[in-house]
Amino acid sequence: MYNIILSIFYPIFLALVFPTQIFLFVVVVKYSPKYMQTLRNVLFCNCIFQTISVVLLCLLQLRQVSHLKPMEIWCYGPLRHFEAIISYCLYFVSQSTSVVSNILVLLTIYLKYEAAKNVTNKQSNKCIVIILLLVPVFVLVGAEIYSVVTHSLLPEVRYLFEVINSNVTDHSVIGYITLQTVPSYLIISIVFGSVFLLPPMGLYTRRKIIFHINSGRDTTSQLKKHQRKTFINGLTLQACLPLVSLCPIFVCYVIVIGTKSELLFEQYCISVLVLLPTFFDPYITLYSVAPYRKQIGMWLGKAKTGPMIVISSIMNL
């Protein structure tokens, strides 16, 4: 039942998300002011990684069979007809791009926090923060490469998967998930960390930004108040989205791993819920970033083409 529903869902989801990501990509590249170059670069990279992630997950259509030992990864998508090592590598690529996307959201929140304080940091400080945020990505990629080399490249392992997948019908087995090696623990720790760190950091940042805005409330025009309100609303949505879509299913994931129980909803839908932010993030960005919202308003005939008051304390990224 799940397989039939998701075989219809994935193509529809891809058809909805892909044009939206392309639209955001064009808006970010063409309509980002010069004072938003750092934010522009972050959003540009996030569009790329989210697009790669959604395309790969729709082609793979994964199911992690958690009650088996070791846990098997089943592929129901078009890539099930390829050799297992190809799908297994692309599985890790989709995982890495999802983690990078979450980290880029954290970087965006950090930039907004620094801008809200109206403090101009040295470029070296931003570089240090970016490097620190990217360290888990390098560790993750290294651990994934090790897993591919040890679990898929060996001739006997490739032959085993050829035998298992010799008569592919609705799915193929592309790999295993074990928690018996240091790289496997690193992978799951980094993935979980990227999911569970975003909501508290986003909500904490929201509280700090509101504090800075309220401290200058008496000297703020109505237009700036409106722009800041939409900015904060966007930050709230950005922080709460993983709290709603990702955290519950990952808690279920931990439970089924620990108990070796079979929960079909978790097995089939964890990949679906990982995809949800790629659908909502473009709309949140277009809503919460004033120049993009202004441009869309002009296209819709709901905004005048006159000069826009820029909230330098928040948007000067």
UniProtKB/Swiss-Prot annotation:
Cellular location(s) = Membrane
A GO CC term? membrane
For this chain, the annotated S-S bridges are none
Family membership: Belongs to the nematode receptor-like protein srd family.
Which species does the entry assign this protein to? Caenorhabditis elegans
Ordered alphabetically, the record's keywords are: Membrane, Transmembrane, Transmembrane helix
Q: What is this protein called?
A: Serpentine receptor class delta-47
Q: How does it sit in the membrane?
A: Multi-pass membrane protein
Record's keyword annotation contains Membrane: yes
Task: Say yes or no: keyword Cytoplasm present.
Answer: no
Domain of life according to the entry: Eukaryota
In terms of InterPro entries, this protein maps to: 7TM_GPCR_serpentine_rcpt_Srd, Nematode_rcpt-like_delta
Q: Where are the transmembrane segments?
A: 8-28, 42-62, 89-109, 128-148, 185-205, 239-259, 270-290
